[in-house]
Regions:
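A well-structured
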Residues: 1-135
């Protein structure tokens, strides 16, 4: 007998309605982030950089939360492929809105990158990996 795994997905979202509200908020936050910082990353003072990357992290964590929820729902019921595809497309669109952050960070001067890393030590590993991947 095959044992079916049951996940309690309520830790992520209690309902589809909550998921939809979260997605709306996530899209709005990503648009605001892009409006505030796209093309302007080089102008951000190093002491303000930590707050900017924290916003970026929150958006990425939101994407991860949504995709974890829909993936586990799909794993439980593979007839839900349309739901998975819907949210995968939406989260990809959200990620595309904020992708500039990584690209622009890699284009900063080495001195600016160093200052940003020093002002955001909790993100040093992530930022250093971005630089290494860009080389």
């Amino acid at each position: 007998m095959i044992e079916v795994t049951e996940w309690d997905l309520k830790a992520l979202f209690r309902s589809e309605e909550q998921l939809e509200r979260f997605m709306s908020s996530l899209k709005r936050n990503a648009r605001q982030f892009a409006k505030a910082y796209e093309g302007k990353l080089s102008e951000i003072k190093s002491q303000d950089f930590c707050a900017v990357i924290r916003e970026y992290e929150e958006i990425l964590e939101g994407i991860g939360r949504v995709m974890t929820y829909v993936f586990l729902g799909f794993a439980k019921d593979s007839t839900q492929g349309d739901v998975y595809a819907k949210y995968e497309m939406q989260t990809t669109q959200i990620h595309n809105l904020v992708l500039f952050f990584e690209l622009e960070f890699c284009k900063l001067s080495q001195n600016q990158q160093k200052e940003c890393i020093e002002s955001s030590p909790q993100y040093a590993y992530f930022l250093q990996k971005l630089i290494e991947q860009d080389e």
